[in-house]
């Protein structure tokens, strides 16, 4: 990994930590509220309220699709009144399903607008929006801009939600269901960098990174498939 790379994510205990490396993750993430008996369901719905998927994760949360085009994402839309499940959303499920929605969204594919463009920043922002909708945080976790802009913000400490960690810690956090982000800053300001989220939940079985970018590298891919070791 070059000096221009980094790993970032939501730090829910931001006041206790400070960015100390190019890597970050959700420190002390309390969002993995999974019912050990696995008998209660999170619902994921389309924009019209039609059921897309049940996930047996112990929560009674309802996430609904909102936005259009590159901005299509899930947001918490309350809790199922007919369920005795936890009133805490399971963020592992939310991140997992948003990553899958990104990959299914034709607007996020390379050249969707006819300019050979890629949409890694919007895909990552969609995951951030999903998480942001489901947590009670004073400062929004969504980071705007292109990939280079997002990487600069994440590494600067300007957004107090993010904590810098090693790659191995970012990976472990994602394995535990937390939000971890990898970014690459292109040293040529006229060219794009790259940013992506670590796979969580069942997505990990498909690949370490949930990557949106050039078509040949879009999908659940190894880290080196998302951010090549030989980048300048």
Task: Go through each PLM region and give its residues.
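N-terminal capping segments
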Residues: 76-144
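...with weaker cross-activation on analogous glycine-rich loops/strands in unrelated enzymes
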Residues: 138-219
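Glycine-rich, aromatic-bearing surface loops/beta-hairpins
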Residues: 212-232
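Loop/turn elements at helix/coil->beta-strand transitions in domains of secreted/extracellular proteins
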Residues: 4, 133, 176-179
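Structural recognition of the beta-strand scaffold that forms the well-ordered cores
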Residues: 7-9, 24-26, 53-54, 126, ...
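Short turn/helix-capping motifs enriched in Asx and small/polar residues
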Residues: 1-84
């Amino acid at each position: 990994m070059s000096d221009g790379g980094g790993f970032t994510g939501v730090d829910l205990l931001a006041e206790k930590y400070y960015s100390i490396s190019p890597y970050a993750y959700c420190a002390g993430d309390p969002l993995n509220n999974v019912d050990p008996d696995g008998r209660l369901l999170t619902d994921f719905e389309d924009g019209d309220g039609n059921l897309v998927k049940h996930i047996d994760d112990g929560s009674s949360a309802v996430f609904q699709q909102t936005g259009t085009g590159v901005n299509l994402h899930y947001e918490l839309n309350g809790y199922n009144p007919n369920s005795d499940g936890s009133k805490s959303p399971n963020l592992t499920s939310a991140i997992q399903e948003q990553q899958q929605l990104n990959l299914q969204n034709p607007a996020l594919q390379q050249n969707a607008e006819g300019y050979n463009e890629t949409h890694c920043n919007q895909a990552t922002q969609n995951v951030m929006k999903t998480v942001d909708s489901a947590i009670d945080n004073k400062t929004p976790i969504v980071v705007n801009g292109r990939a280079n802009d997002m990487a600069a913000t994440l590494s600067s400490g300007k957004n107090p939600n993010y904590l810098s960690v090693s790659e191995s810690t970012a990976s472990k956090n994602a394995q535990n269901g937390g939000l971890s982000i990898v970014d690459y800053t292109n040293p040529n300001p006229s060219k794009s960098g790259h940013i992506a989220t670590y796979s969580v939940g069942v997505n990990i079985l498909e690949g370490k990174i949930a990557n949106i970018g050039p078509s040949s590298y879009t999908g659940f891919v190894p880290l080196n498939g998302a951010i090549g070791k030989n980048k300048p």
